[in-house]
Design a protein with these regions (language model features):
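Conserved beta-strand-loop-alpha-helix junction that forms the acyl-donor binding cleft
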Residues: 118-128, 144-149
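Conserved acetyl-CoA-binding loop-helix of GNAT-fold acetyltransferases
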Residues: 91, 97-110, 133
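Terminal substrate-recognition subdomain of acyl/acetyltransferases
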Residues: 2, 118, 133, 137, ...
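A short helix-loop-beta-strand connector motif used in the catalytic cores of GNAT acetyltransferases and
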Residues: 50-64, 158-161
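A short beta-loop-alpha structural element at the N-terminal edge
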Residues: 10-24
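Conserved GNAT-fold acetyl-CoA-binding loop/helix
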Residues: 27-52
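Conserved beta-strand in the GNAT
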Residues: 64, 70-78, 85-90
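A short, internal acetyl-CoA/4′-phosphopantetheine-binding micro-motif in the GNAT/acyltransferase core
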Residues: 89-96, 120-122
Length: 171
């Protein structure tokens, strides 16, 4: 009926006009990193408009989870040579623990026929557990370093303080 709120949940690409909301979601959820990741790696905002634009220009495609007509979670993918990277996976704090992130990652895995890699902060134990619950395997430090150097455009400090998880795992 007109005027009623939708009770359906929807997985879809994030629309251009939702990029400001995407930043709100990313920066709100990234607050969990404050005090957990090395102090010299934290900055405010965690992601700026400029950084989001750069990520999109570099090929990151954002998918969103809409709950009752409201975007509450985002997760990006980026095709890099022979793999797909999971990039910038964030859910509004008030919606965490409700299956939003799990639905997003399952959807992105369904869309990809290639190995998927995700990098996150080594100190973000909650993020590592999330990816492990969704069949990603934490890789050894030597392999992590090689993959971060090969597939991501990040500085040495971030390489030193990050981990990589893979699905399917490397043998």
């Amino acid at each position: 009926m007109p005027g009623e709120k939708s009770t359906t949940n929807l997985l879809r690409r994030v629309r251009e006009e939702e990029l400001p909301l995407t930043l709100v979601i990313i920066n709100a959820a990234a607050e969990m990193y404050r005090g957990a990741i090395p102090r010299d790696c934290w900055h405010e905002p965690y992601m700026s408009d400029r950084e989001l634009d750069e990520e999109i220009r570099a090929g990151v495609e954002f998918w969103g989870y809409e709950q009752q007509g409201r975007l509450v979670g985002v997760m990006g993918t980026q095709a890099v040579r022979d793999v797909d990277l999971i990039r910038h996976a964030y859910v509004l704090p008030s919606c965490q623990g409700q299956g939003v992130g799990g639905a997003l990652i399952a959807h992105l895995r369904d869309l990809s026929a290639r190995r998927m890699l995700v990098g996150t902060w080594a100190a973000a134990s909650w993020a590592i557990r999330f990816y492990e619950r969704h069949s990603f395997q934490l890789l050894e430090p030597e392999m992590t370093r090689r993959l971060l150097q090969a597939y991501w455009r990040i500085g040495e400090r971030q390489i030193e303080t990050s981990v990589v998880l893979a699905n399917p795992p490397y043998q």
